[in-house]
Amino acid sequence: MSELLSLQETLYTSRNPTRRWLHRTRRARIEETLRLAAATAGSGRALEVGPGSGVYLPLLCQLFDDVVASDVEEAFLANARELAGTHPNLRPVADDITASGLPAQSFDVVLCSEVIEHIEDSEGALRAMHGLLRPGGLLVLSTPQRHSPLELAGRIAFLPGIVTFVRAVYREPILATGHINLLTAPEARRQLAGAGFDVLESGQSGVYLPLVAEFTGRIGLKLEQWIERRMIGGRLSGLLWVQYYLARA
């Protein structure tokens, strides 16, 4: 698990320009949406489901009076407890969102970023999040898209003989994603609606071109960014890496 923490912390400072851009773009999009959610739903209580290395917890603690970080992994909870030492309004809690013991209708905002792809019953998890929100509360959600080339490459990268080459190219932590439940945008919208949410805003980001990303550096990144601008909102938007939602309970 310490390897996973190391990986998550490395993503935003990666020596690879594409890898760094993909994750920083996602972080910036989530942070922008969290600020909007706090301004809309109020700055009372927020919950982050699956905080991982805790990249969003300091901002949540700035925006909200009371912040709960729930996870099933002790390493992530231990990391959150360290952050709580400097953020007294942060409370880490061991909790499984698929069988949550947190009080119903007790949060103004729930953040769930890059989590439901690890949960087989994502519909059940979304229903649980809806139940934790006060009426009118907001969910900030992100998850990878099923047909993203990056997700396909992530599966290929761990085939026998290939992973050694990939690690040699990146020269930083490379671990299997553990994604077992990748959704298309229509599937994600259907599950959100089935859980009782109304989608207020949505979007996508992230172009990954195999080999271009690994071997052409900043030149390749500029090409990927140019392609992304032309794909967003178009018929090929399902190939972008991450999908984002701001939804009301």
Regions found by a protein language model. Give the residues of each.
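S-adenosyl-L-methionine-dependent methyltransferase catalytic module, highlighting the catalytic core
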Residues: 3-28, 55, 72-79, 83, ...
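Conserved alpha-helix/loop element of class I SAM-dependent methyltransferases that forms part
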Residues: 24-43
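Conserved class I S-adenosyl-L-methionine
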Residues: 43-52
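Conserved SAM-binding loop of SAM-dependent methyltransferases across substrates and taxa
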Residues: 53-64
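Conserved SAM-binding motif I beta-strand of class I
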Residues: 66-71
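Conserved SAM-binding strand-loop segment of SAM-dependent methyltransferases
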Residues: 86-99
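A short acidic, Gly/Pro-enriched loop at the edge of an enzyme's catalytic core
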Residues: 98-109
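A short beta-strand submotif of the Rossmann-like class I SAM-dependent methyltransferase core
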Residues: 112-115
